[in-house]
UniProtKB/Swiss-Prot annotation:
Superkingdom classification of source: Bacteria
SUPFAM superfamilies reported in the protein's UniProt record: NAD(P)-binding Rossmann-fold domains
UniProt: NAD(+) binding residues: 9-33
EC number: 1.3.1.56
Source organism of the structure: Metapseudomonas furukawaii
Binding sites annotated in the UniProt record for substrate: 140
Origin organism lineage: Bacteria, Pseudomonadati, Pseudomonadota, Gammaproteobacteria, Pseudomonadales
Gene3D superfamilies for this protein: NAD(P)-binding Rossmann-like Domain
Family indicated by similarity: Belongs to the short-chain dehydrogenases/reductases (SDR) family.
Positions of the catalytic residues: 153 (proton acceptor)
Gene Ontology MF annotations: cis-2,3-dihydrobiphenyl-2,3-diol dehydrogenase activity; oxidoreductase activity, acting on NAD(P)H, oxygen as acceptor
InterPro entries given in the database record: BphB-like_SDR, BphB_TodD, NAD(P)-bd_dom_sf, Sc_DH/Rdtase_CS, SDR_fam
Protein known as: Cis-2,3-dihydrobiphenyl-2,3-diol dehydrogenase
Pathway(s) per entry: Xenobiotic degradation; biphenyl degradation; 2-hydroxy-2,4-pentadienoate and benzoate from biphenyl: step 2/4
Amino acid sequence: MKLKGEAVLITGGASGLGRALVDRFVAEAKVAVLDKSAERLAELETDLGDNVLGIVGDVRSLEDQKQAASRCVARFGKIDTLIPNAGIWDYSTALVDLPEESLDAAFDEVFHINVKGYIHAVKALPALVASRGNVIFTISNAGFYPNGGGPLYTAAKQAIVGLVRELAFELAPYVRVNGVGPGGMNSDMRGPSSLGMGSKAISTVPLADMLKSVLPIGRMPEVEEYTGAYVFFATRGDAAPASGALVNYDGGLGVRGFFSGAGGNDLLEQLNIHP
């Protein structure tokens, strides 16, 4: 029970990875969730009870972020961990495929949600300094490698890599700042409305089939499997030395081979192991 008595604020926590994080943290901690969907927040509170506080708001609004922080402190007395997680994906729309008439609006939408929303979340939380807390940014494999999105999403996520490092410096020694880069997952993450993708969810893309032969671990992880790295960084004792750390938590994308996703596909046969 390393997180017992802790209070956590998660943005974009009513679906997808955010919901999985809420479910994981609420087993020990109190959790506040900022999300735009009042309906999903109501479901969350019904499912998880008094240990969860749902707050309707837009991560692009600093006032909404400040209100979320204020309500979390009013309800739970403090904030120990902030997880800026809300985001949208550009569905790997290449630069040549971005319509000129939509480019400016799409850029603003992706960066306002995926970057400005993260900056607002931290700006709204001087309470983290008081609690000597920590920030855990959700990045993406696109923060480290190409082809995890189009240029808009990739640029936004690589901006968060820089943000982790800068804020880890600026907020030291009082607040630890780290980042987790999950890989592909089956979630409800949407696309930019400015590109006509506002109602499109990642779950409609056959990612599991696409990634099976690409990832060294041989499969696409379940959403819940990504939550462990966040729990580690949030745990004061285990992660006390960690600040400015970036974890590629993506099924081994960085070690895939030229001709095969995994080099040990024949190990069982070679070692005469029969599971």
